[in-house]
Each structure stands twice: as C-alpha cells, then as structure tokens.
Amino acid sequence: PDGRNAAAKAFDLITPTVRKGCCSNPACILNNPNQCG
C-alpha cells in the first residue's frame, strides 16, 4: 500500500538533480521542455 508514496518521494528527490543537469544542456532542454519550463 505504501509503494506509490515511496516512489513519489524518490521521484521528488531525483527530479531536482535531473532538472539541474538537464536544463544546463540545450539538447536535453529540447527533449524535456516540460521539466525545464
């Protein structure tokens, strides 16, 4: 029952790192416009 919550927490931890790394890379920004806004 707790699996989805744990996954959401893990995603919240991972996302800022992805955002920083990806959004400093123009090619990645183009591939992930919703993450880099």
From Swiss-Prot:
<keyword id="KW-0872">Ion channel impairing toxin</keyword>
<comment type="similarity">
    <text>Belongs to the conotoxin A superfamily.</text>
</comment>
<feature type="site" description="Moderately important for binding to nAChR">
    <location>
        <position position="30"/>
    </location>
</feature>
<feature type="disulfide bond">
    <location>
        <begin position="23"/>
        <end position="36"/>
    </location>
</feature>
<keyword id="KW-0528">Neurotoxin</keyword>
<comment type="function">
    <text>Alpha-conotoxins bind to the nicotinic acetylcholine receptors (nAChR) and inhibit them. This toxin inhibits mammalian alpha-3-beta-2/CHRNA3-CHRNB2 nAChR (IC(50)=9.4 nM (rat), IC(50)=8.8 nM (human)), as well as the subunit chimera alpha-6/alpha-3-beta-2-beta-3 nAChR (CHRNA6/CHRNA3-CHRNB2-CHRNB3)(IC(50)=2.1 nM (rat), IC(50)=1.7 nM (human)). Binds to rat alpha-6/alpha-3-beta-2-beta-3 more rapidly than to alpha-3-beta-2, and dissociates more rapidly from alpha-3-beta-2 than from alpha-6/alpha-3-beta-2-beta-3.</text>
</comment>
<feature type="site" description="Moderately important for binding to nAChR">
    <location>
        <position position="35"/>
    </location>
</feature>
<feature type="site" description="Important for binding to nAChR">
    <location>
        <position position="32"/>
    </location>
</feature>
<dbReference type="GO" id="GO:0099106">
    <property type="term" value="F:ion channel regulator activity"/>
</dbReference>
<keyword id="KW-0027">Amidation</keyword>
<keyword id="KW-0008">Acetylcholine receptor inhibiting toxin</keyword>
<dbReference type="GO" id="GO:0090729">
    <property type="term" value="F:toxin activity"/>
</dbReference>
<keyword id="KW-0165">Cleavage on pair of basic residues</keyword>
<dbReference type="GO" id="GO:0005576">
    <property type="term" value="C:extracellular region"/>
</dbReference>
<feature type="modified residue" description="Cysteine amide">
    <location>
        <position position="36"/>
    </location>
</feature>
<feature type="site" description="Important for binding to nAChR">
    <location>
        <position position="31"/>
    </location>
</feature>
<feature type="site" description="Moderately Important for binding to nAChR">
    <location>
        <position position="34"/>
    </location>
</feature>
<keyword id="KW-0964">Secreted</keyword>
<dbReference type="InterPro" id="IPR009958">
    <property type="entry name" value="Conotoxin_a-typ"/>
</dbReference>
<keyword id="KW-1015">Disulfide bond</keyword>
<feature type="disulfide bond">
    <location>
        <begin position="22"/>
        <end position="28"/>
    </location>
</feature>
<feature type="propeptide">
    <location>
        <begin position="1"/>
        <end position="20"/>
    </location>
</feature>
<keyword id="KW-0629">Postsynaptic neurotoxin</keyword>
<protein>
    <recommendedName>
        <fullName>Conotoxin Bt1.8</fullName>
    </recommendedName>
</protein>
<dbReference type="GO" id="GO:0035792">
    <property type="term" value="C:host cell postsynaptic membrane"/>
</dbReference>
<feature type="site" description="Important for binding to nAChR">
    <location>
        <position position="29"/>
    </location>
</feature>
<keyword id="KW-0800">Toxin</keyword>
<dbReference type="Pfam" id="PF07365">
    <property type="entry name" value="Toxin_8"/>
</dbReference>
<dbReference type="GO" id="GO:0030550">
    <property type="term" value="F:acetylcholine receptor inhibitor activity"/>
</dbReference>
